Amino acid sequence: MLRIDIITIFPEMFRGPFDVSILKKAQDRGFVEIKVHNLRDFTEDKHRTVDDYPYGGGSGMVMKPEPIFKAVKTLRKEKSEVILLSPSGDLFNQKIAEELSKKDHLILICGRYEGVDERVKKIITREISIGDYVLTGGEIPAMVLVDAIVRLIPGVLGDPNSLKEESFQWGILEYPQYTHPREFEGMEVPEILLSGNHKEIRRWRRKEALRKTFLKRPDLLEKVELTQEDLELLEEIKKELREEV
């Protein structure tokens, strides 16, 4: 079972997201144990201070190293992965999520204010960012990591095929999805999906997934290993797009 410990100064932020849906079921069924810890519980002064002014001047407050060190030392096990959520970290992606889902123990440190004291880097194993934008703190990034990681644990999702067909699981975006009704406000479900021809449906889905990726995230096509069929489908897509102009 994976254990995830989250260190934060706002533990109340995690009450809702982890108490519903797949994350709650994963905890109830024993696939993961998630514990949220208030960083102030690891302080030693009467004011429970977790931040201070930066040396050298400047705006904002910096998170102090002492409580973070104490929290990590208290929670750390032999094979713990200690992660600092930070704008300067590695950009989080599906590959990292898969890697972390195979770990036994994760400790997530939620940064805050203008950052954390640089000496905290001494006790972490990696830094992770969820994107090139500014957030108030590391709490929301921690939630993103937990959600992405937990759903990859075998058995968490009811249908194992759901995982195989998701966007990014095979390096490209997912194909378009349709459900009932067959026709809605003049928009119809593609006829191929009603044909019952599973070979042609599979081909259509792969082609549309490649089309969506080519139009919206062409950078992904440079990273994924494409089959000969994929290359042929891409040529078809490019030809169709040229004809539309």
UniProtKB/Swiss-Prot annotation:
Which keywords appear in this protein's UniProt record, sorted alphabetically?
A: Cytoplasm, Methyltransferase, S-adenosyl-L-methionine, Transferase, tRNA processing
Query: Gene3D superfamilies, per this entry?
Result: 3.40.1280.10, tRNA(m1g37)methyltransferase, domain 2
What are the protein's GO molecular function terms?
tRNA (guanine(37)-N1)-methyltransferase activity
SUPFAM superfamilies given in the database record = alpha/beta knot
Primary localisation category: cytoplasm
Does the record bear Methyltransferase in its keywords?
A: yes
Q: Name the positions where S-adenosyl-L-methionine binds.
A: 111, 130-135
**One Gene Ontology cellular component annotation held by this UniProt entry:** cytosol
Top-level EC class as recorded in UniProt: transferase
BP GO annotations: tRNA N1-guanine methylation
Assembly information from the UniProt record: Homodimer.
Q: Which HAMAP family match?
A: TrmD
In terms of NCBIfam families, this protein maps to: PRK00026.1, trmD
Name the family. Answer: Belongs to the RNA methyltransferase TrmD family.
Protein name, as recorded: tRNA (guanine-N(1)-)-methyltransferase
Q: Which organism is it from?
A: Dictyoglomus thermophilum (strain ATCC 35947 / DSM 3960 / H-6-12)
